[in-house]
From Swiss-Prot:
The record marks P106, T167 as: Involved in interactions with PP2Cs. It comes from the Eukaryota. Residues 34-191 are annotated as: START-like. InterPro entries: Plant_def-hormone_signal, Polyketide_cyclase/dehydratase, START-like_dom_sf. This is Abscisic acid receptor PYL10. It holds the Pfam family Polyketide_cyc2. It comes from Oryza sativa subsp. japonica (Rice). Coiled coil: none annotated. Belongs to the PYR/PYL/RCAR abscisic acid intracellular receptor family. One of its GO terms (biological process) is abscisic acid-activated signaling pathway.
Length: 212
């Protein structure tokens, strides 16, 4: 009798059940594994959202407007695309955005490159390429997966250099805290959008019966 492959348990701290992790394990292996070298750290975070995957993905894919769900961004402007004459808002891998960060953080600006925008599989990735901040060589991937009929799972991972004078734990704590806050905002925005869409699609109530 052939022995079944044993599914490894979810990574510690991810907050997923064994059954949930089994559903997204292939996604984790394909998109959320990094070759972490000396002086680097990485992390993987998860967020359940009670909204259809399409509603969540519609928010995540907005490389041109991350402030919709990212707390600490004041503004975002797409750079002109040197490879296309239209210079419109088309989102293609290689596009750059200039992000302005709110005061109070150890950053002021960030130049970021869109690496991956896969609408079919709902995979989004970007790299920080410049700016005034301490997150050097920061690279992130976000995936949107359906868990069941009413629940979507968002996974966000990153790899980044540990700044001089900081430890891996310090760096991971800072980045994880920002991402958790953003994922919580993503949850509230996506669920509100889904509820509004459902309400708009609902048939109108029948007119009241006429009095006899």
């Amino acid at each position: 009798m052939e022995q079944q492959e044993e599914v490894p348990p979810p990574p510690a701290g991810l907050g997923l059940t064994a059954e949930e992790y089994a559903q997204v394990r292939a996604t984790v292996e394909a998109h959320h594994r990094y070759a972490v070298g000396p002086g680097q750290c990485s992390s993987l975070l998860a967020q359940r959202i009670h909204a259809p995957p399409a509603a969540v993905w519609a928010v995540v894919r907005r490389f041109d407007c991350p402030q919709v769900y990212k707390h600490f961004i004041r503004s975002c402007v797409l750079r002109p695309d040197p490879h296309h004459d239209d210079n419109g808002n088309d989102l293609r891998p290689g596009r750059l955005r200039e992000v302005s960060v709110i005061s109070g953080l150890p950053a002021s600006t960030s130049t970021e490159r869109l690496d991956l925008l896969d609408d079919a599989h709902r995979v989004f990735g970007f790299t920080i390429t410049g700016g005034e901040h301490r997150l050097r060589n920061y690279r992130s991937v976000t995936t949107v997966s359906q868990l069941d009929e009413i629940c979507t799972l968002v996974l966000e991972s990153y790899i980044v250099d540990v700044p001089d004078g900081n430890t891996e734990d310090d760096t991971r704590l800072f980045a994880d805290t920002v991402i958790r806050l953003n994922l919580q905002k993503l949850k509230s925005v996506s669920e509100a959008n889904a509820n509004a869409a459902a309400a708009a699609a609902a048939p109108p109530p029948p007119p009241p019966a006429a009095a006899e």
